[in-house]
């Protein structure tokens, strides 16, 4: 799923997705059946908890749709948990400066690209059946979407765009 999504973007193709604010996995199955490429599971404004998100991610995988979790704020635990439960990417809103972007990357990626906390007994590591190097490589390739908001972000756009990752 992730490679196909990235390939489409690299080839200049459009990808189509839907924001979901419900906790019912059925909606994600229907979206997948309908032919969309991805779904953004909104934990910033939606009523779901981490367990609901994990079930929503399973529904996305079942129907071949890329699950991206929109996390509510920049925090190492929030970002790590979203990725640990199997999200193939994260979206972060309220980005205002390059330092915000650097924090997101640091929290989302494992060493040497970041400082994400390690636990291999999670869904994303196939409950430790993936070896450590394969797990780190897979996780460091996941999608990070930043959402710039406010005048400060626009004023800092050039420095934000210079951040690698």
Describe each model-derived feature in a short phrase.
Residues 77, 89-164:
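Conserved anion-binding
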């Amino acid at each position: 799923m992730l490679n196909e999504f990235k390939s489409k973007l690299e080839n200049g193709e459009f990808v189509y997705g839907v924001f979901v604010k419900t906790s019912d996995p059925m909606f994600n199955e229907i979206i997948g059946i309908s032919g969309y490429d991805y779904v953004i599971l909104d934990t910033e404004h939606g009523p779901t908890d981490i367990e609901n998100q994990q079930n929503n991610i399973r529904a996305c995988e079942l129907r071949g749709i890329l699950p991206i979790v929109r996390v509510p704020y920049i925090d190492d635990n929030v970002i790590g948990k979203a990725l640990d439960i199997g999200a193939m990417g994260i979206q972060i809103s309220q980005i205002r400066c390059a330092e915000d972007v650097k924090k997101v990357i640091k929290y989302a990626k494992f060493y040497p690209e970041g400082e994400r906390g390690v636990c291999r007994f999670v869904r994303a590591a196939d409950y430790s059946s993936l070896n450590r190097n394969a797990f780190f490589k897979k996780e460091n390739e996941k999608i990070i979407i930043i959402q710039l908001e406010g005048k400060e972000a626009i004023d800092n756009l050039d420095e934000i765009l210079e951040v690698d990752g």
